[in-house]
Amino acid sequence: MNSKFQLILSTFVVIAAFTLLPRPCASIEFHRKLSSWSNGGATWYGAANGAGSDGGACGYQAAVDQAPFSSMIAAGSPSIYKSGLGCGSCYQVKCSGNSACSGNPVTVVLTDECPGGPCLSEPVHFDLSGTAFGAMANPGQADQLRAAGVLQIQYNRVPCNWGGVMLTFAVDAGSNPSYFAVLVKYENGDGDLSGMDLMQTGAGAAWTPMQQSWGAVWKLSAGAALQAPLSIRLTSSSGKTLVASNVIPSGWKPGASYTSTVNY
């Protein structure tokens, strides 16, 4: 009986000790939460309650101050602008080092490039619109926060979610029957693109890679008249693909915009 009791007691002690050990999964999750925010710098440009510049280096033009962007935009340092491949990506930004900071995150979309000044002196820098910079403030203290001019902030890359806004293909005004250029906006998820392909209509139709022209504009020089309707395949920065079948109709026009029923 004594040996049996000792065996039971030893088993209990081992189990109890095991339950007190740190759980690897819990520790990993804890550190993941700690590392979800990174440090960066922020300034602001343009009008105090404006959208930064009129359009920006990504090519979104008047869309920057209209819904759903609604002036909540940022010009990114080279590390996040990525020569235009970062256009359309979404970030949460917040500040806490100024008495006017609310500490609450606000979401901005990358629509422009910040090529100099503090954007080159820090690994990651956001030159925010006046609207977005002020949105980080306590209620009624937006002007006080903007007066600071420069802030240290925390930022986090987040999925874009444009609600019911449709994926839009804006055909460049310089397009013609054999040269096609297009800007895509309002992509959910990654928001930015790493590749784009086009497929014409007709026998033997196949996907043809497009090239980045500038900012968020992609182009294809076909050498002959393109046969519409045209389908476009998007590849996001994380490798996710999406096909917008026949999104560019027959009789398409340069400068016109066409919407898709699909989105990421």
UniProtKB/Swiss-Prot annotation:
Membrane topology, from the record: Peripheral membrane protein
GO CC, any one term: membrane
Top-rank lineage group of the source organism: Eukaryota
Domain Expansin-like CBD stretches: 178-260
Intrachain S-S bonds: 58-87, 90-160, 95-101
Predominant place of localization: secreted
Cell location: Secreted, Cell wall; Membrane
Residue ranges annotated for the Expansin-like EG45 domain, each copy included: 55-165
GO terms, biological process: plant-type cell wall loosening; sexual reproduction
SMART domains: DPBB_1
InterPro entries tied to this protein: Expan_Lol_pI, Expansin/allergen_DPBB_dom, Expansin_CBD, Expansin_CBD_sf, LolPI, RlpA-like_DPBB, RlpA-like_sf
Family: Belongs to the expansin family. Expansin B subfamily.
Main function: May cause loosening and extension of plant cell walls by disrupting non-covalent bonding between cellulose microfibrils and matrix glucans. No enzymatic activity has been found. May be required for rapid internodal elongation in deepwater rice during submergence.
Protein name, as recorded: Expansin-B18
Organism: Oryza sativa subsp. japonica
